[in-house]
C-alpha cells in the first residue's frame, strides 16, 4: 500500500546516527578478531551508511563460548523462573515500542523498505511476536504418563541449548525476533548472524537486550558474511541447533554442514514459488488486490510471494486488465518519502538477477503488459512488471524471482490447476480465491503447501505456525508448533513401591 493510505504514521527520523556497529557478545561490544569491517549501504541511494565489524570463525567461537557459559546448569539464565523469562521478553517489547520510530527509520534506510510498512507492519509484528512468545514462557510443560508397572513416569520439555540463528535481509528485524523470541521463551541461548546487507537493527537490538536485563551471553550477535560467519555457526561442534531463513541453495549447505559436524538440529525456512489460484466465481476486486499485494509487497522480496498466478480462462482477460491497471499506480522513489509506494531492491546482485529473469520472460514469449526494466538513475529500482500469456515451462514461471514481477497464467479445470500448482520443488504457501466452500476445501487439501490462504493472501500472525513443504524447508516457526523446534523431550522414569491410579 502507498504511504499516503496509511494512517497515523509519523515522519521518519532525520540525520540518523548508527551507534551500534560492533559485535555483541556477553552483553558487551567487541571489535572483530581480524580487525576487518564491512560497509553497509542504503539501496535507494547507493550511499554508504556506515561500516560494521566483520565477524568470522574466531568471533563465532567467542560468541558460542559465551552462549554455552550462559547455558550452564546453575547459571542465572538456567535457574531463572520461566515467568521471569516472559517478563524479560515483555520488557524487550516495551523497549522496541519506545524505539519504534528509530527502528522503523533504520529498516527503511538500510533495507529499502517503505517507511510506512516498516513502522506499521514490521514493527507492529515485532512487538506482537515478542508478547506472544512472552506469554508462552511458563506454559511449556511436560506430562505424566501411566506407564505399566510400579513406576512413576513424566516428561520434561527442556531447552535445546545453544542455538545458531541466521537471519535474512528482507525482514531483518521481524525475522530476528521470530528467531530469538521462541528460543528465549524456551530457555535457550543464541548466537545470531544478521544478513550482511542489513545488520543495523539487529545490532541496535543488542543494546535493548542488555537494557531489558537479559543475563550476559544469553543473546550474542555476530555480523558477518554467510561463507565465513554463517558457515562457522552451521558447522560448529558446540552449537546444538541452527535455524535459517533464506535461499534454498544456502539452506542445503547449512543442512550439510550440520550433518558433517555434530548432527545439530536444523530448521529451515527457504524459497518459494507460490501458486495463487483465482476461480471464475471469486470476488474479482478482492482477488486482484490480494494477488497484487501478494507479489508486489516489499518490491516482491517475500518468500511467500504469489509468484505463480493461475486465473480461470473465462475471467482471464479482465483479470489481466485490472492487474495491469493496479500495477501502473505505483510511485517509485526513496522509501522515506511520503507518497512513495515502491522502494528499491536490496542490492546490485538481486537487481541484476531480477532484470535477467525479466529479459528471459520477454525472450521466451510471455507478453509484457507493463514495466519490464530499471527505473531512475540511482538506486536499485525496477519498474512494476506484469507478464501475461505465461506458460509453465518459462523461467519466470519456475524460478524464484524475488522482485516486483507478476506472471499470470491461464487454466481451464480444477484438476489441471491443482496438478500445475503442485508441479514445483517448492511448497511454502498458496492462495485460493473462490466463493465455493467445497472448492476451497478440496483445493486447499490438495495443495502441497505449508500455508494456504482462502480469499486472502500473505496473512501471517504470531499465533499461526509458518513453514514449508518440500524444498521450502522443514520445521515450523511461531504458533505452538514453533516452540517444539526449541525444546527437547526428556522421559524420566522412577521406580516406586506401589502405583495407584
From Swiss-Prot:
Q: Which residues carry this modification: N-acetylserine?
A: 2
Q: Where is this site: Transition state stabilizer?
A: 170
Question: Where does the record place the modification N6-acetyllysine?
Answer: 91, 128, 252, 353, 367, 410, 419, 495
* Post-translational modification Phosphoserine, affected residues: 413
Sorted UniProt keywords? Acetylation, Cell projection, Cytoplasm, Lipid metabolism, NAD, Oxidoreductase, Phosphoprotein
Pfam (any one):
Aldedh
Phosphothreonine: residues carrying this PTM? 337
Keyword NAD included in the entry's annotation: yes
Q: What does this protein do?
A: Cytosolic dehydrogenase that catalyzes the irreversible oxidation of a wide range of aldehydes to their corresponding carboxylic acid. Functions downstream of retinol dehydrogenases and catalyzes the oxidation of retinaldehyde into retinoic acid, the second step in the oxidation of retinol/vitamin A into retinoic acid. This pathway is crucial to control the levels of retinol and retinoic acid, two important molecules which excess can be teratogenic and cytotoxic.
> This protein is called what?
Aldehyde dehydrogenase 1A1
> What organism does the UniProt record list as the source?
Bos taurus
List the lineage, top down: Eukaryota, Metazoa, Chordata, Craniata, Vertebrata
Q: Which gene encodes it?
A: ALDH1A1
Amino acid at each position: 500500500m502507498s504511504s499516503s493510505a496509511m494512517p497515523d504514521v509519523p515522519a521518519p527520523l532525520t540525520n540518523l546516527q548508527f551507534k551500534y556497529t560492533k559485535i555483541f557478545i556477553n552483553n558487551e561490544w567487541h571489535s572483530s578478531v581480524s580487525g576487518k569491517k564491512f560497509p553497509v549501504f542504503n539501496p535507494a541511494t547507493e550511499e554508504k551508511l556506515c561500516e560494521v565489524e566483520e565477524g568470522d570463525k574466531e568471533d563465532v567461537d567467542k560468541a558460542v563460548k559465551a552462549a554455552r557459559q550462559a547455558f550452564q546448569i546453575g547459571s542465572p539464565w538456567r535457574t531463572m523462573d520461566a515467568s521471569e523469562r516472559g517478563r524479560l521478553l515483555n520488557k524487550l517489547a516495551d523497549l522496541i515500542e519506545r524505539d519504534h520510530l528509530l527502528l522503523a527509520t533504520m529498516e527503511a534506510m538500510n533495507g529499502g523498505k517503505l517507511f510506512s510498512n516498516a513502522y506499521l507492519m514490521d514493527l507492529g509484528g515485532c512487538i506482537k511476536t515478542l508478547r506472544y512468545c512472552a506469554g508462552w514462557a511458563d506454559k511449556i510443560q511436560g506430562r505424566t504418563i501411566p506407564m505399566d508397572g510400579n513406576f512413576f513416569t513424566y516428561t520434561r520439555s527442556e531447552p535445546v541449548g545453544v542455538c545458531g540463528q541466521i537471519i535474512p535481509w528482507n525482514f531483518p528485524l521481524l525475522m530476528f525476533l521470530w528467531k530469538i523470541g521462541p528460543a528465549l521463551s524456551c530457555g535457550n541461548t543464541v548466537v545470531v548472524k544478521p544478513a550482511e546487507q542489513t545488520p543495523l537493527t539487529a545490532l541496535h537490538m543488542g543494546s535493548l537486550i542488555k537494557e531489558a536485563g537479559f543475563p550476559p551471553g544469553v543473546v550474542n550477535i555476530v555480523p558477518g558474511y554467510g561463507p565465513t560467519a554463517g558457515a562457522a555457526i552451521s558447522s560448529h561442534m558446540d552449537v546444538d541447533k541452527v535455524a535459517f531463513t533464506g535461499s534454498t541453495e544456502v539452506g542445503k549447505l547449512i543442512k550439510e554442514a550440520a550433518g558433517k559436524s555434530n548432527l545439530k538440529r536444523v530448521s529451515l525456512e527457504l524459497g518459494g514459488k507460490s501458486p495463487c489460484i483465482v476461480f471464475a466465481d471469486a470476488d474479482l476486486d478482492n482477488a486482484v488486490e490480494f494477488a497484487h499485494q501478494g507479489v508486489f509487497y516489499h518490491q516482491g522480496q517475500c518468500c511467500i510471494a504469489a509468484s505463480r498466478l493461475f486465473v480461470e480462462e473465462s475471467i482471464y482477460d479482465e483479470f489481466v486488465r485490472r492487474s495491469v491497471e493496479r500495477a501502473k499506480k505505483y510511485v517509485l522513489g526513496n522509501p522515506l518519502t511520503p507518497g512513495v509506494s515502491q522502494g528499491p531492491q536490496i542490492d546490485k546482485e538481486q537487481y541484476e538477477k531480477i532484470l535477467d529473469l525479466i529479459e528471459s520472460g520477454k525472450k521466451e514469449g510471455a507478453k509484457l503488459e507493463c514495466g519490464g526494466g530499471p527505473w531512475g538513475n540511482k538506486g536499485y529500482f525496477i519498474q512494476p512488471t506484469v507478464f501475461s500469456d505465461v506458460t509453465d515451462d518459462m523461467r519466470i514461471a519456475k524460478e524464484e524471482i524475488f522482485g516486483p514481477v507478476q506472471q499470470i497464467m491461464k487454466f481451464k479445470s480444477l484438476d489441471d490447476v491443482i496438478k500445475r500448482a503442485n508441479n514445483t520443488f517448492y511448497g511454502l504457501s498458496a492462495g485460493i480465491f473462490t466463493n465455493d466452500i467445497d472448492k476451497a476445501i478440496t483445493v486447499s487439501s490438495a495443495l502441497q503447501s505449508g500455508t494456504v490462504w482462502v480469499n486472502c493472501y500473505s496473512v501471517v500472525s504470531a499465533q499461526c505456525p509458518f513453514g514449508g513443504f518440500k524444498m521450502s524447508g522443514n520445521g515450523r516457526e511461531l504458533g505452538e508448533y514453533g516452540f517444539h523446534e526449541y525444546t527437547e523431550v526428556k522421559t524420566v522414569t522412577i521406580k516406586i513401591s506401589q502405583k495407584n491410579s
